[in-house]
A protein has these predicted regions:
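Pepsin/retropepsin-fold aspartyl endopeptidases
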Residues: 1-140
């Protein structure tokens, strides 16, 4: 497979920065935070409604941790199609959690909300490399 290059945006923070990437979820544009420390890709419980209906969720018996919060309730959803550039991920089973704390912080910074977090499950599977200098996510 040839390399696929996807532009990323560096959002400057007081104490560092966040990496943001635009992908497609079921054909619609989605804005995700790239988090190499996140074990899996997750979507916000409110924002995912832009991509699929709530009846597509099922309760997840496991509590999720991370993203600067304590344990949180989660749901599972199946996304028919995630597009990372030319890569198509079909029937992706994802965790849906409350990311409102991230979006409230983004709102205070006058930034658009994120739809989810692109985690290391997808990054690793597709051998992703982040080129900070060129502001690119490279999929091999």
């Amino acid at each position: 497979m040839a390399k696929i290059t996807i532009p990323i945006r560096l959002l400057k923070l007081d104490d560092g920065f966040h990496l943001l990437v635009n992908i497609r979820v079921n054909g619609k544009r989605a804005r995700l935070l790239i988090d190499t420390g996140a074990s899996q890709t997750v979507f916000d419980k409110e924002r995912i409604k832009n991509f699929l209906s709530k009846e597509k969720f099922e309760k997840h018996n496991k509590l999720s941790t991370g993203l600067g919060t304590s344990n949180m309730k989660s749901h599972l959803a199946v996304i028919k199609n995630i597009s990372l550039g030319k890569i198509e991920i079909k029937n992706y089973k994802t965790v849906v959690i409350d990311l409102s704390h991230v979006n409230v912080a983004y709102s205070h910074m006058k930034q658009k909300p994120i739809d989810g977090v692109l985690g290391s499950d997808i990054l690793r599977k597709y051998k992703a490399v982040i080129d900070y200098g060129k502001k690119k996510l490279i999929i091999r």
